[in-house]
Amino acid sequence: MLLPAPALRRALLSRPWTGAGLRWKHTSSLKVANEPVLAFTQGSPERDALQKALKDLKGRMEAIPCVVGDEEVWTSDVQYQVSPFNHGHKVAKFCYADKSLLNKAIEAALAARKEWDLKPIADRAQIFLKAADMLSGPRRAEILAKTMVGQGKTVIQAEIDAAAELIDFFRFNAKYAVELEGQQPISVPPSTNSTVYRGLEGFVAAISPFNFTAIGGNLAGAPALMGNVVLWKPSDTAMLASYAVYRILREAGLPPNIIQFVPADGPLFGDTVTSSEHLCGINFTGSVPTFKHLWKQVAQNLDRFHTFPRLAGECGGKNFHFVHRSADVESVVSGTLRSAFEYGGQKCSACSRLYVPHSLWPQIKGRLLEEHSRIKVGDPAEDFGTFFSAVIDAKSFARIKKWLEHARSSPSLTILAGGKCDDSVGYFVEPCIVESKDPQEPIMKEEIFGPVLSVYVYPDDKYKETLQLVDSTTSYGLTGAVFSQDKDVVQEATKVLRNAAGNFYINDKSTGSIVGQQPFGGARASGTNDKPGGPHYILRWTSPQVIKETHKPLGDWSYAYMQ
């Protein structure tokens, strides 16, 4: 693990060099590994701890304030977060920050910025490493239970998100930040050159989604690690878990005012931060229309900013599984069911369109329907046999229901399985498989963000044309997968689909990226592809300064050729 902060700091500040043209030597290294995903088998200690945490949350509502300037603040605009699978259970009571409070948060953040930016990276890294250790150990059951109850995740989906991925973000970002300090320019005597990785000048607005607790922690945490101050607007439907992450960071040693925790109405928050002259960045995950609107607001206000704001955004996708006739059928079926229906299809990377060759369709269809009948949808807190639970809220339920009604009425579409909806207790939608005769049907093109898988069956001899179709059908470019045992086909698909997916999988499902292994993100309408989880992501949140110090005075202003 990491050296103690004083020792690491000394190591970072003592980069020896000898001779012309040699780079500074990085004398310290932080070794980290991906957090193991726990199994939660019957009788295991992690399962017992989680069940106790779930029991403690049953019927309970937590009061969550805005936290501005190290002060807990309540406004009159009270909101509630309900459990998706039991909307009669209010899991959190919180309030929206008004414009005045948001401006106060900006002022408090700016007042803390210089001191935080000057803090050695080793000290900042230690805070996030401690938070990761807390999440890995004593706070694991709490964050999992709050993610399950508040966001409707099953135990494994909560585990790979709120525990493993969030822990990995904190640890790997710390590793990358420490190593970045060692990336220095060459020095040629009589001069010494160095780079200082400063935070951005101003504040960063972090706007996080409901579907991953880890994303919220990273959107706010990564800029803070790099010396920035942050206004964090968490999702209304992930408030319970987001506040737990914030509290853990504070308990791990994050000073007050570095991250302001400000639930707020989305448009008001966007208007307020983009009208501030001190905005220096927006770190966003959410919908394409919202990100475009924020981008336009920044452009309209460009003349007032002290610096050009950095915009990083991840906006979803219409992700594909392309199947060649040489594919392994069981791999296709299992991977597609997981990708399309885990967490109710509410992952940015979820498979939403499946392209199958005619020769394999009878076999794949039969296996999909057979396995579909075994999928259990229910209460993940009471029944650990649940594969996925309710969708996040009434708005999402209504949108998905509208798509299912479209599937029933369109002459080009046939519902093969599922598609029933029931919001009497929770926002439940059955996993639905739809076959489309038209590859350009809207259900094959537009993001649904629910448990709906659309299938197009193509002629075997048209696989190259179908690859072109996959590439051109949607405006997105987030994730995709190709299933084939033919290396030539894989090579062809990789070329044709080069820009169709920022995360491209061969004989594997389109979901499940792991920090440090598959940095995540896509281009086109899917976002700015800054690849959180990778070593380059933190560069978005630093403004490097290069310093040259000359050790031999310049004795004469004139040049030799002038003599």
Swiss-Prot record:
* Record bears the keyword Phosphoprotein: yes
Q: Which Gene3D superfamilies match?
A: Aldehyde Dehydrogenase, Chain A, domain 1 (3.40.605.10), Aldehyde Dehydrogenase, Chain A, domain 2 (3.40.309.10)
Keywords attached to this entry: Acetylation, Disease variant, Mitochondrion, NAD, Oxidoreductase, Phosphoprotein, Proline metabolism, Transit peptide
Any Gene Ontology biological process: proline metabolic process
Metabolic or biological pathway, per its Swiss-Prot or TrEMBL entry: Amino-acid degradation; L-proline degradation into L-glutamate; L-glutamate from L-proline: step 2/2
**Catalytic site:** 314 (proton acceptor), 348 (nucleophile)
Keyword Phosphoprotein present in the record's keywords: the answer is yes
List localization entries: Mitochondrion matrix
- Give the modified residues of type Phosphoserine: 44
Q: Which GO CC terms are listed, alphabetically?
A: cytosol; mitochondrial matrix; mitochondrion
InterPro entries per UniProt: Ald_DH/histidinol_DH, Ald_DH_C, Ald_DH_CS_CYS, Ald_DH_CS_GLU, Ald_DH_N, Aldehyde_DH_dom, P5CDH/ALDH4A1
Q: In which tissues is it expressed?
A: Highest expression is found in liver followed by skeletal muscle, kidney, heart, brain, placenta, lung and pancreas.
Residue numbers for the site described as Transition state stabilizer?
211
- Residues with the modification N6-acetyllysine, per the entry, are 52, 93, 99, 114, 130, 175, 318, 365, 376, 462, 509, 531, 552
Molecular function per GO: 1-pyrroline-5-carboxylate dehydrogenase activity; aldehyde dehydrogenase (NAD+) activity; electron transfer activity; identical protein binding
- This protein's transit peptide sits at 1-24
In the record, the note on similarity to other proteins reads: Belongs to the aldehyde dehydrogenase family.
Describe the protein's quaternary organization and the partners it interacts with.
Homodimer.
Associated disorder is: Hyperprolinemia 2: An inborn error of proline metabolism resulting in elevated plasma levels of proline and delta-1-pyrroline-5-carboxylate (P5C). The condition is considered to be benign, but affected individuals can exhibit neurological manifestations that vary in severity. Clinical signs include seizures, intellectual deficit and mild developmental delay.
The UniProt entry, under PANTHER family, shows: 1-PYRROLINE-5-CARBOXYLATE DEHYDROGENASE FAMILY MEMBER, DELTA-1-PYRROLINE-5-CARBOXYLATE DEHYDROGENASE, MITOCHONDRIAL
Annotated function? Irreversible conversion of delta-1-pyrroline-5-carboxylate (P5C), derived either from proline or ornithine, to glutamate. This is a necessary step in the pathway interconnecting the urea and tricarboxylic acid cycles. The preferred substrate is glutamic gamma-semialdehyde, other substrates include succinic, glutaric and adipic semialdehydes.
Q: Which NCBIfam families match?
A: D1pyr5carbox1
- Identify this protein by name: Delta-1-pyrroline-5-carboxylate dehydrogenase, mitochondrial
Query: Species lineage, top-down?
Result: Eukaryota, Metazoa, Chordata, Craniata, Vertebrata
